[in-house]
């Protein structure tokens, strides 16, 4: 295995249960050979230079995820790590409120992966398409060492008008 300890890592939030969608959208086949949207992101990220990927998933979807997207990533030569987003992974002194069943969101997902992230990293959603340019921009930025107190965070942004579909709106529930 290559030494990838200091090369940028791609962290992918893929723990969603797809309740509105009706299934696991992060592994749903959309491409002509059964590719998921995430497979396209992994391809583009790998071409941009990312060698290590951390999938943040739930134990409930582990088998389905590992046998599809996880297997594709490993076959493509990516170093794959897993982190598990569970409700009880919280900072010291915090507890899960009685009756809480939904995950805490983005920050909690990243916290869940803290033990397997050991280098500068980029975060994406498993069910969004970003395109190769996005991965090239973020990989090159992180590789250039733009981290530390002066540059603690970075994001790739897009003009809203360039991202809205002409085919209609998206309902968030």
Stretches found by the model and what they are:
Residues 25-31, 96-100, 170-171:
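Short glycine-enriched, charge-decorated loop/helix-capping segments at active-site entrances
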Residues 132-173:
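Conserved core of the sugar-phosphate nucleotidyltransferase
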Residues 18, 129-131:
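A short, conserved beta-strand element in the Rossmann-like catalytic core
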Residues 119-129:
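Short beta-strand-to-loop acidic/aromatic patch adjacent to the donor-nucleotide binding site
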Residues 2-71, 80, 85, 119:
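N-terminal glycine-rich phosphate-binding loop and ensuing alpha1 helix
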Residues 13-14, 81-83, 123-125, 152-159:
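Short beta-strand segments
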Residues 74-120:
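Short phosphate-binding loop-to-helix
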Residues 38, 113, 127:
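Residue-level signal for inorganic ion chemistry
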